[in-house]
C-alpha cells in the first residue's frame, strides 16, 4: 500500500500546479512529475483529475473552516472574537500562498462550480456564526446597530482576502517586486483589524439624502 506521504506529495503538487496554470492546463502526468511519483499512483487515490481537484479545494477550505471556526466558539467579547477571526484568516492565507491564486482561478475560470458545495457548507456554518457574533455585539451595544450583519461579515472577510488574492498588484502598489515582505503583511493585518473594529464602533456616516438636505438648507 502506498505511504500516506505520497498522498500529501500529490495534493501539494496538484495544488501548486492548479494555482499556477489552472485546472484545464494541468495534466495528471505533470502532477505526478511534480510530486515525484509515478502518475499511475494518482489513480490509486483519485479516480480522475476532477476528484483530485476537489480534494485540493476540500483540504484548504476545510482547514480554513475548522481553524476559523475554533475562534468563534470561545467566550471572548464580540469585537475581540471578530479580531481573532480576521487574524486567523490572514494567517491561513499567508501560510498557504497557493490558496489565494487557487481561489481566484476557481472563481474566474469556473464561477466557483467545483467549490460550490464547500462554499454552501461554509455559508451555512462559518458565515452564519460570524453574523451571529455581529448580532450579539449589536444586542450588547458594542457594535453599531445600523449595520446589516451579513454585509458586515462579507466586508470584514473581503478586505483581508483581497490583500492576498491581489498580491501581485498590492505588492507593486506598496513598492515591492514579488511578494510583500512578512513584516509588512503583519502591519497590514494590524491595520485591517483596527480599521474594521473602528468601522463597527464609530458613529454612522450621514446618508447621501441627509447630506443633500443640509446643503439645500
Segments and roles (model prediction):
Residues 10-18, 89, 196:
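Short hydrophobic clusters on alpha-helical segments that form packing/core surfaces
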Residues 88-91, 95, 124-140, 158-217:
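C-terminal peripheral helix-coil segments that are non-catalytic and often amphipathic
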Amino acid at each position: 500500500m502506498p505511504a500516506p506521504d505520497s498522498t500529501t506529495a500529490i495534493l501539494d503538487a496538484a495544488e501548486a500546479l492548479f494555482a499556477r496554470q489552472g485546472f484545464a492546463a494541468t495534466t495528471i502526468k505533470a502532477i505526478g512529475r511534480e510530486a515525484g511519483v509515478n502518475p499511475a499512483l494518482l489513480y490509486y487515490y483519485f479516480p480522475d483529475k476532477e476528484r483530485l481537484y476537489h480534494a485540493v479545494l476540500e483540504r484548504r477550505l476545510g482547514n480554513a473552516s475548522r481553524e476559523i471556526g475554533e475562534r468563534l466558539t470561545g467566550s471572548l467579547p464580540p469585537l475581540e472574537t471578530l479580531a481573532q477571526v480576521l487574524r486567523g484568516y490572514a494567517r491561513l492565507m499567508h501560510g498557504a500562498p497557493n490558496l489565494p491564486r487557487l481561489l481566484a482561478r476557481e472563481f474566474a475560470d469556473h464561477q466557483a462550480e467545483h467549490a460550490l458545495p464547500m462554499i454552501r457548507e461554509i455559508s451555512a456554518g462559518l458565515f452564519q456564526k460570524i453574523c451571529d457574533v455581529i448580532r450579539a455585539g449589536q444586542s450588547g451595544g458594542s457594535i453599531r446597530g445600523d449595520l446589516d450583519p451579513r454585509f458586515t461579515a462579507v466586508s470584514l472577510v473581503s478586505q483581508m482576502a483581497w490583500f492576498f488574492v491581489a498580491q501581485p498588484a498590492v505588492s507593486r502598489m506598496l513598492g515591492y517586486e514579488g511578494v510583500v515582505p512578512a513584516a509588512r503583511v503583519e502591519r497590514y493585518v494590524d491595520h485591517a483589524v483596527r480599521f474594521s473594529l473602528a468601522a463597527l464602533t464609530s458613529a454612522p456616516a450621514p446618508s447621501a439624502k441627509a447630506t443633500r438636505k443640509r446643503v439645500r438648507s
